[in-house]
Regions:
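A conserved beta-strand-loop-helix scaffold within acyl/acetyltransferase catalytic domains
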Residues: 43-86
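Short loop segments at secondary-structure junctions
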Residues: 63-64, 90-91, 145-148
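Conserved acetyl-CoA pyrophosphate-binding loop and the N-cap/start of the following alpha-helix
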Residues: 91-100
């Protein structure tokens, strides 16, 4: 259930960040996740759409063109997970990912949580600026991964065929 009470927008130097789901360019988001990201290669558009429906989404736009994205999966009470963060290559190097994280962490509905988490292979220095650290007590965390997903670039195509 999407708990958004209202659409919010932020402007900076010709760019806009918006929580308006109606503005999301699903083909752009899907293309990046399924074809350019290391974490979601091959992910079906239906899976991306379902994830968007159950997240607080932050679209990054230059004019009307979507150039970046992030989403937060949360219970709006104690826990938030930042996922699927990206800025298209031609818009990188302008501080947009930093601005996106500033906006997310300042969002009024995302305050007072006990814990924020995320996973990254290559952007540790970005997230450290915002107080993210390696898991404090990793021995307390567990995961239940799909054994077929681990490092399998065809995972999402396989899931799609078997459903």
């Amino acid at each position: 259930m999407n708990m958004q009470d209202q659409v919010r927008e932020w402007q900076r130097g010709g760019y806009t960040i918006s929580t308006d789901d109606a503005r999301l360019d699903i083909p752009t988001i899907h293309d990046f996740i399924a074809n350019q990201s290391y974490w979601g290669r091959g992910r079906a558009v239906e899976v991306v759409q379902r994830a968007l429906e159950h997240s607080l989404n932050f679209g990054l736009y230059h004019g009307k063109q979507q150039v970046g994205f992030a989403r937060v999966v949360t219970d709006y009470a104690t826990f938030a997970w930042v996922a699927d963060v990206f800025v298209l290559a031609e818009h990188r190097g302008r501080g947009l990912s930093k601005w996106l994280m500033e906006v997310i962490l300042a969002h009024p509905q995302l305050q007072g949580f006990r814990r924020w988490v995320l996973a990254t292979k290559d952007a540790h220095s970005l997230y450290e600026r915002f107080g993210f650290i390696p898991l404090h007590r990793p021995e307390r965390w567990m995961e239940r991964p799909d054994p077929n997903m681990q490092e399998n670039p065809d995972y999402w195509r396989t899931v799609r065929r078997n459903r």
